[in-house]
């Protein structure tokens, strides 16, 4: 394979990308990953100060990143966001990264109706609706990609809350459905399911005992880093991954494949 062709297979240069929740944790790493490959990115966040701080840093790095203040859990704001993206990118979008997510970890019997609505609107409805809104833009690009940021909690039972887990499982199924339904439109869809990653969200939600137990179950014996997730997200959107669609790929240090035979190293 010629060098130029090889390089093109592993390129995201000039690709247009929308990343929701791109100012923190995995979302922040995804923005920087794609920007490092030469993509043109628009991201959104609720906190205007944090967004502007990130945009300023990215500008200094020479990244092509713009941003909107937006609560993507709200339908009118999602519609406004997609109008902005459509105008900015000339009615086309190459890549949609549905990264927005939130968690309230409780026993099932302690969840309220408001907790249920919160998780559904933030984790599931936002991704579902944004995918609907993005469809004509992705189709117009001729080679669209959708990534749903899921969780291993949507693959196996995890003590992080049944509603959160249900929304992540739904995202995995949504990736499968859209992969089949929209394949004829030139759109691929995949889900990426991390385990506990070293992010501010993980620090805020999980106590030390929980973290210790999780690490003890991981054959690699540590938490993952955001960049170890963003690298997979970038790969899935490259021409090199053109035959991968409808998949849920775990990024978990081996956690989901660890049965009873493995004993963590002391």
UniProtKB/Swiss-Prot annotation:
Coiled coil (UniProt feature): none
Active site, renumbered: 164
UniProt keyword terms in alphabetical order: NADP, Oxidoreductase
Disulfide bonds: none
Top EC group: oxidoreductase
Ligand binding (NADP(+)): 18-42
GO molecular function: oxidoreductase activity
EC number(s) on file: 1.1.1.-
Residues annotated as binding substrate: 151
UniProt xrefs under PROSITE patterns: ADH_SHORT
Domain of life: Eukaryota
Name of a matching Pfam family: adh_short_C2
Protein family (similarity comment): Belongs to the short-chain dehydrogenases/reductases (SDR) family. SDR65C subfamily.
Protein name: Tropinone reductase homolog At1g07440
Lineage: Eukaryota, Viridiplantae, Streptophyta, Embryophyta, Tracheophyta
